[in-house]
């Protein structure tokens, strides 16, 4: 049977034009609404096309809202759609009609829309919908690599249109049923409605890019045949729930298409919780998706020692978080968040991870990558809760750094014999736990547990990478002990600094 895939662009190029949250939101919403217009026009051709994904209803309750659940005001449609082709059809003519309708609705010159937006299509034969999704996604990935140059008039017209987000924009009427909708500045989002600035984090915002793990394997699995439309409906409902929670926190949802989330949020929200607490609540909303996938018993085949092995596939959410000063360029912050997600969090074994980059206005840069299923995730929560005054945190970090060589003689292979006892002795003799107050002692013990975990995890991962390289016959340069310790201590210091920052540092001139 023939299958059709549709892909929209240029998303990244459009986002690069945005300077303010309003413009960032508008850039995202345009693509979601364009997809909605395409789905609406193709729905009229049910005899020729059968929609596989995403789910679409003429009166989409998730986007339209009701009295109990007002308009979400965020794009809920992804940039790709998939159809089964039941009989030949002039798809280009239908897409042209959809584009004209889109341009009319958002009050954009149709020639500008035609010249700027890329509506890419691929139509190929496949034996099943699951195989079609896998194959068509690869084909679309290749199509996206083809760059298109725009003339200056088209570029300027889109830029001018996005700037309208600061006054009146037709997209507001579509998204919120209002002629104008107030979207806060980065400074306003950072403050989270606080009347005065008491902590430095109130001058910083979080740009968060999140993505469902193993989703490619899931949607292209045999177990998903005939169920993709229902699954898409569940993902849209999740996106709606996540957006409502982000808004309640004081954040701004930018995009919620399927398992993909993009939003801007304060470090600490209007409800008193911090950004990690918000992520925990989004994960709770995602639990329904996890349960659904587990019920389907999705499987994948992997090669293990030259033999094919069938393993269950589970899903979770991974996050890339860029914490930046409110005057930092928004697009660059988004690039950092994307890099933290796809180059860091998604590379953690088992995924289900958070990767945080804190870029201080002073120029300091701190990064932490952690699995939510491992102890360091809970250690960070504890460190935030028990972090004492600034000078004490710096003193602990200094003690660790000053004794790098001493710590370098600790055991480096499992089962890490006597590591706990030797670290206890180090903290008693060098860090001087006994001389501290009860709160400071609690904090120190938390830092010891954190260091121990980071230390063990580093060498376990180092061994895994070496074995993987050997198995795949690839070159592998083993780091020296000095390099090992510098990396471990750098990660440890970043965890302490990020915990202290989220807990609340004194306001300084920045």
Model-predicted segments: where are they?
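Regulatory and interdomain segments flanking nucleotide-handling catalytic cores
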Residues: 1-510
């Amino acid at each position: 049977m023939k299958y059709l895939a549709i892909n929209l662009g240029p998303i990244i190029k459009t986002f690069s034009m945005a300077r303010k949250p309003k413009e960032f939101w508008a850039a995202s919403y345009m693509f979601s609404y364009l997809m909605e217009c395409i789905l609406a026009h193709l729905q009229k051709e049910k005899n020729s096309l059968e929609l596989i994904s995403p789910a679409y209803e003429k009166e989409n309750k998730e986007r339209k809202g009701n009295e109990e659940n007002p308009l979400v005001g965020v794009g809920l449609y992804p940039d790709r759609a998939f159809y089964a082709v039941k009989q030949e059809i002039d798809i280009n003519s239908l897409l042209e009609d959809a584009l004209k309708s889109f341009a009319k609705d958002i009050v954009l010159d149709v020639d500008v829309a035609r010249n700027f937006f890329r509506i890419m299509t691929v139509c190929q034969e496949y034996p099943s919908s699951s195989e079609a999704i896998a194959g068509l996604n690869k084909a679309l990935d290749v199509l996206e690599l083809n760059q298109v140059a725009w003339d200056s008039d088209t570029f300027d017209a889109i830029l001018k249109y996005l700037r309208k987000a600061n006054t009146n924009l037709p997209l507001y009427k579509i998204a919120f049923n209002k002629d104008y909708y107030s979207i806060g500045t980065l400074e306003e989002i950072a403050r989270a409605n606080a009347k005065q600035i008491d902590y430095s984090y109130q001058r910083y915002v979080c740009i968060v890019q999140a993505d469902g793990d193993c989703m490619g394997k899931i949607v292209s699995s045999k177990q998903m045949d005939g169920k993709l439309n229902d699954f898409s409906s569940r993902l849209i409902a999740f996106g709606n729930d996540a957006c409502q929670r982000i808004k309640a926190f004081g954040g701004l949802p930018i995009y919620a298409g399927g398992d993909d989330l993009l939003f801007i949020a304060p470090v600490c929200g209007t409800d008193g919780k911090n950004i990690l607490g918000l992520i925990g609540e989004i994960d709770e909303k995602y639990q329904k998706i996890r349960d659904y996938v587990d019920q389907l018993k999705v499987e994948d085949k992997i090669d293990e020692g030259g033999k094919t092995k069938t393993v269950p596939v589970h899903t979770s959410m991974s996050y890339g978080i860029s914490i930046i000063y409110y005057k930092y360029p928004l697009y660059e912050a988004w690039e950092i968040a994307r890099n933290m997600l796809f180059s860091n969090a998604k590379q953690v074994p088992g995924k289900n991870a958070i990767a945080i980059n804190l870029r201080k206005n002073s120029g300091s840069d701190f990064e932490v990558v952690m699995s939510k299923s491992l102890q360091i995730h809970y250690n960070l929560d504890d460190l935030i809760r028990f972090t004492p005054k600034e000078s004490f945190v710096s003193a602990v970090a200094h003690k660790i750094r000053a004794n790098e060589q001493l710590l370098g003689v600790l055991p480096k292979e499992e089962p890490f014999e006597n590591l706990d006892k030797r670290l206890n002795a180090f903290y008693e003799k060098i860090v001087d736990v006994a001389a501290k107050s009860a709160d400071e002692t609690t904090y120190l013990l938390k830092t010891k547990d954190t260091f121990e975990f980071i230390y063990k995890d580093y060498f376990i991962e180092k061994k895994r990478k070496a074995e993987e390289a050997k198995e795949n016959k690839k070159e592998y340069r083993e780091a020296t002990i000095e390099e090992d310790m510098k990396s471990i201590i750098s990660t440890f210091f970043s965890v302490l600094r990020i915990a202290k920052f989220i807990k609340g540092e004194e306001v300084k001139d920045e």
